[in-house]
Amino acid sequence: AHTVRAVSLVPGEAPAAVLDLGCGPGAQTAALASALPEARIVAVDVLPAMVEEAGRRFIERGIDDRVVAVMGDMAAPPVTPASQDLIWSEGAIYNLGVTEALRAWRPFLKSTGTVAFTEPVWLMDSPPTEILDWWLAEYPAITDSAGVRAQVEAASFRTVASFALPASAWWEEYYGPMEQRIAALRTRLPDDPVASEVATAAEAEIDYFLRFSDCYSYAFFIVQPID
């Protein structure tokens, strides 16, 4: 639902050429394709397993005639410069940093192009020390929405619209499936120390979310180049 809402906030005509960077298994790419039935979408991820899963998803949805998954670097996507109406990135821009990513992606946008991305943000000025310390260890660059807008401006972009995702979106699309994967991992590899460490870290993240979801969220930002 939040993907569709973000699409509705993209200014101008419906984008025809769309680039989804850090696409993962392609769930939001498929949602994009539904919201933009005329668009041709290139979904990019650095992990072969993600590209394969996304490709299977597109075939199953019957959209593989206009939506393709390819392996590539989100900092240097495998598309022609000045060719994209919309660059999309959910839960992945942190790999580059907001300002750095926007500067890297700008050459691939058409003059009227738009970038839409999600970024974790604080929802309060003084979060509890426990969750503050956890986030600073996981992602030291986390800031509030005003801080993200400043990072956008530093890249010579302007924020057209933004909104925070509700806690339900985190659970339905991220932590709920994660909980299922943890259970499957523990069942499949009960004595594997690496698997156990991964599962324990993921369980800790879920616990923090359940206790502190009023302190932080992901927010969507829809931005355009200033000139």
What would you call each of these model-derived segments?
Residues 19, 25-76:
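Class I SAM-dependent methyltransferase SAM/SAH-binding core
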Residues 163-227:
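Conserved Class I S-adenosyl-L-methionine
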Residues 1-14:
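Conserved alpha-helix/loop element of class I SAM-dependent methyltransferases that forms part
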Residues 141-156:
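Short alpha-helix
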Residues 75-86:
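A short acidic, Gly/Pro-enriched loop at the edge of an enzyme's catalytic core
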Residues 86-99:
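A short SAM/SAH-binding and catalytic strip from SAM-dependent methyltransferases
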Residues 100-114:
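A short glycine-rich, Lys/Arg-flanked "PGG" loop and its adjoining helix->strand segment in the class I
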Residues 120-139:
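Short, glycine-/aromatic-enriched active-site segment of Class I SAM-dependent methyltransferases
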